Amino acid sequence: MNLRPLHDRVIVKRIESETTTASGIVIPDNAAEKPDQGEVLAVGPGKKNDKGELIALNVKVGDRVLFGKYSGQTVKVNGDELLVMKEDDLFAVVEK
């Protein structure tokens, strides 16, 4: 199954954080916080302004983005846990 986001929504896959600290302590899954970074997998066409003109999104497929820990709606697709969220829920694009 493929998802095609509508309007100003994006599909994001969380990027898992390290499960071992710098000192070598292993953090169990249930104690680890949800990561707040992800990779954009798909973007919608954008949203319309007051004049009816389509405004494209600022993010693109492949961008690494920052978002709130509880942002978006979680969906499972082909065994992967993905997030569907509005572009407004994104805080920043991580530049390489």
UniProtKB/Swiss-Prot annotation:
GO terms for biological process: chaperone cofactor-dependent protein refolding. One of its GO terms (molecular function) is protein-folding chaperone binding. Coiled coil: none annotated. GO terms for cellular component: cytoplasm. Keywords: Chaperone, Cytoplasm. InterPro entries: Chaperonin_GroES, Chaperonin_GroES_sf, Chaprnonin_Cpn10_CS, GroES-like_sf. It holds the Pfam family Cpn10. The keyword Acyltransferase does not apply. It is found in: Cytoplasm. Together with the chaperonin GroEL, plays an essential role in assisting protein folding. The GroEL-GroES system forms a nano-cage that allows encapsulation of the non-native substrate proteins and provides a physical environment optimized to promote and accelerate protein folding. GroES binds to the apical surface of the GroEL ring, thereby capping the opening of the GroEL channel. Belongs to the GroES chaperonin family. This is Co-chaperonin GroES.
